[in-house]
Each structure stands twice: as C-alpha cells, then as structure tokens.
Amino acid sequence: MYVGYVLDKDSPVYPGPARPASLGLGPQAYGPPAPPPAPPQYPDFSSYSHVEPAPAPPTAWGAPFPAPKDDWAAAYGPGPAAPAASPASLAFGPPPDFSPVPAPPGPGPGLLAQPLGGPGTPSSPGAQRPTPYEWMRRSVAAGGGGGSGKTRTKDKYRVVYTDHQRLELEKEFHYSRYITIRRKSELAANLGLTERQVKIWFQNRRAKERKVNKKKQQQQQPPQPPMAHDITATPAGPSLGGLCPSNTSLLATSSPMPVKEEFLP
C-alpha cells in the first residue's frame, strides 16, 4: 500500500529503512509521531517571580474600625444581654424604681380660713378705713342667686338676672355709664347673657339713675312758702260816706224828668 511505500522510502522525516513494529496493526492504528515540545517563549520569566505586585490605589473611604482585641474581652468581659421585651413591660406606667417627689407643705386649713385683716396678719393704718368700693368685694353665695331664667309678665317675658350678674354689671356701670361694643360682647360671653340683654340692662340702669338724682334734688331744695298778696281792709262807713256825696251830687245836678199822668175813664 501507499503507507508502506512511504515508510520503505528513505526520507528525512523518518530516517532509516527500519519499519516500526506498529505496522502490523493496520493503517488505522498508525499515525505520525508527536512533534518535539517547543521551547518556552519567555525562558527567563521565572527570574521575575520575586517581584512584588503593585500596591492597590487608595480608595475614597478609609478602612473600617478594627475588630476588638482579645485582651479587651478578657479585661471587661462580655456585656450584659438585653432583656427581652414582654407585653406587660410595654404598657404605659411609671418604671418600677420610680418614686414621686413629695409636694411642698402647703398652708393648712386654718391659714386658709383666716380672714384678711385678722389678728395673725399685720394691718396697715389705711386698712382700718372702709373703702368706697366695699360693695365690689362681696361674693355671691353658692346657689344663692339661682340660675338665669325668665319670668312671665302680662305682655312679655322679663329676664331675671342673678346676683353675680347684677354685681358684675354694677361694677361695669360704676366705671362707665355707656358701655362699648367690645366690652358689651365680653360681658355677655362671661356672664352667659346676650348682648341685647346687657344693652337693655344699661338703658334701664341709666333711667333709674336719672330718676334717683331727680328725687334727691327735690329733697335737697327747701320748701318755698306760698305768695302772699297785700290786701288792706277798709271800714265800710267812710268808704260809703265818701261814695254817697258823689252820688248825691250827681243826682242833684241831674234835671228832673216830667212825669206824665194818665187817667183811666
């Protein structure tokens, strides 16, 4: 065959006429010998194995915190474990070790019940005199005035003011006879009245004051005696005597009238 011819022929690839022992296996098992190993491309590469790698470029962030040393754990020991939260501990309330701060001692009931200007408090010389506004210091007893209501009259309802409402309205009337709109709204809100009720109260209070002042003026004026006329009594005699001569003179001077006599047959 052709394979045997090539092997028998002297060639520079297979020198020598000797046939290899593998020729008896047939043409399928025979193949060309493996080429010799090629020399390394960089024979001196091993000489650079001792070169250290280049350092990595620095990053923008620094290194993290170092791990805790072993001697720290040995010196301080592990920290106490946090207790697990129970549903009862989540409820609102003071902590177990909470102790309220004691309140400062206040004045006893005896001090509160002591009135102003009593024997325990020093009184000034001016406190002995009663002030002209003593009525302003009166306090209405609880439940004494009753609630604000209305009473029925013949034609309309009349508002019944409580003692507290009248006291506050009197205070305002003492300082100003004519209430302003702003003050009227404030008083109505504080006393539980309407602005119309406050306005009507001030109108009635001014009318009452005018009536009282007029009555005082009449009482202060002294009573005047009635006007006496000068009447002089004259005796009747002289006056008649004075009038009679004049009348007689008039009669004497007058001519006598003729009297006509008529006779009946």
UniProtKB/Swiss-Prot annotation:
Database matches in Pfam families: Caudal_act, Homeodomain
Keyword Phosphoprotein among UniProt keywords: no
Keyword Translocase: no
CDD domains, per the entry: homeodomain (cd00086)
InterPro entries associated with the record: Caudal_activation_dom, Caudal_homeobox, HD, HD_metazoa, Homeobox_CS, Homeodomain-like_sf, HTH_motif
Keywords attached to this entry: Activator, Developmental protein, DNA-binding, Homeobox, Nucleus, Transcription, Transcription regulation
Disordered: annotated segments: 9-153, 207-265
GO cellular component: chromatin; nucleus
Pro residues bias locations: 30-42, 93-108
Biased composition (Polar residues): 245-256
Bias-annotated ranges (Basic residues): 207-217
Family to which the UniProt record says this protein belongs: Belongs to the Caudal homeobox family.
PANTHER family given in the database record: HOMEOBOX PROTEIN CDX (PTHR24332), HOMEOBOX PROTEIN CDX-1 (PTHR24332:SF16)
Record's function text: Plays a role in transcriptional regulation. Involved in activated KRAS-mediated transcriptional activation of PRKD1 in colorectal cancer (CRC) cells. Binds to the PRKD1 promoter in colorectal cancer (CRC) cells. Could play a role in the terminal differentiation of the intestine. Binds preferentially to methylated DNA.
Name of the protein in question: Homeobox protein CDX-1
Originating species: Homo sapiens (Human)
Gene expressing this chain: CDX1
